[in-house]
């Protein structure tokens, strides 16, 4: 009983700092509409239980002065400089691979007649059992798995905010085509035109790029939202889940 009481008192002493840091987490990843997603709450509960972000790595991020306070990584997942493409992932997969096909995508399966169904993140019964999951859970988020729980793939709200709040300039960095994004506060980051992988081919490098979000396109759940960019255009788009695209993560345990 004495041991239990000591633990209880220690836990109470820890609560104020835990709550303070939890508030920082929520401010860093709150959606534009003021709500926090279920997957964000999952990360937060994990933090509250452990009292820290044990696997967080100090990857560099930039404060663009965005209204939400979101901090974006300066490099893609798997890259060490802003102009490097980094690793290519299918949506909801956390390990890079050499070939991206319908058949080897983790969350699709086929019946004996060759019809394709979705095993996770599905909002329509035409595609199989419905789970109504519309955002990647942390264990399926390549940024979270590869960089630690302080990092996530961006939500659709964060993508839209980035598109609408920054000025975009098509340019080169060390010979690599891409967009220089300048935020409201004058800080900037570079998104290389990394192309995409389909099958074993790397397509359209230097011409355009797609960057995954963690948000499902719920009207057609075999598609998800991404950042699309080329020399003349940039916006949020929806695209098939099985392709190999790069990831620019957002920081979720720290704000400006």
PLM regions with names:
Residues 8-17:
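Bacterial N-terminal signal peptides
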Residues 57-256:
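Conserved positions within compact, well-structured domain cores
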Residues 17, 52, 170-171:
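A short hydrophobic/aromatic micro-motif that marks alpha-helical segments and, especially, helix-coil
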Residues 18-22:
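Sec/Tat signal peptide C-region and signal peptidase I cleavage site
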Residues 1-8:
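Bacterial N-terminal signal peptides that target proteins for export
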Residues 24-56:
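Alpha-helical segments with a strong preference for the paired helices of cellulosomal dockerin domains
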């Amino acid at each position: 009983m004495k041991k239990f009481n000591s633990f209880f008192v220690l836990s109470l002493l820890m609560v104020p700092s835990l709550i303070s840091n939890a508030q920082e987490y929520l401010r860093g990843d709150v959606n534009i509409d003021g709500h926090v997603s279920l997957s964000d709450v999952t990360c937060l509960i994990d933090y509250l239980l452990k009292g820290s972000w044990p696997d967080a790595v100090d990857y560099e991020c930039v404060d663009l002065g965005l209204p939400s306070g979101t901090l974006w990584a300066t490099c893609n997942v798997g890259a060490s400089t802003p102009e490097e493409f980094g690793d290519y992932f299918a949506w909801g997969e956390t390990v890079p691979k050499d070939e991206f096909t319908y058949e080897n995508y983790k969350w699709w399966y086929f019946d004996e007649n060759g019809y394709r169904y979705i095993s996770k993140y599905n909002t329509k019964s035409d595609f199989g059992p419905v789970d109504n999951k519309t955002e990647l859970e942390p264990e399926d988020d390549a940024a979270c798995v590869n960089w630690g729980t302080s990092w996530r793939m961006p939500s659709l709200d964060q993508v839209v905010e980035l598109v609408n709040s920054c000025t975009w300039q098509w340019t080169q960095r060390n010979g690599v085509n891409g967009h220089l994004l300048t935020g409201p506060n004058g800080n900037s980051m570079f998104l290389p035109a990394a192309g995409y992988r389909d099958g074993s081919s790397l397509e359209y490098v230097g011409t355009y790029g797609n960057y995954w979000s963690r948000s499902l396109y719920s009207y057609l759940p075999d598609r998800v939202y991404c950042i699309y960019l080329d020399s003349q255009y940039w916006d949020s788009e929806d695209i098939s889940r099985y392709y190999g695209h790069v990831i620019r993560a957002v920081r979720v345990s720290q704000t400006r």
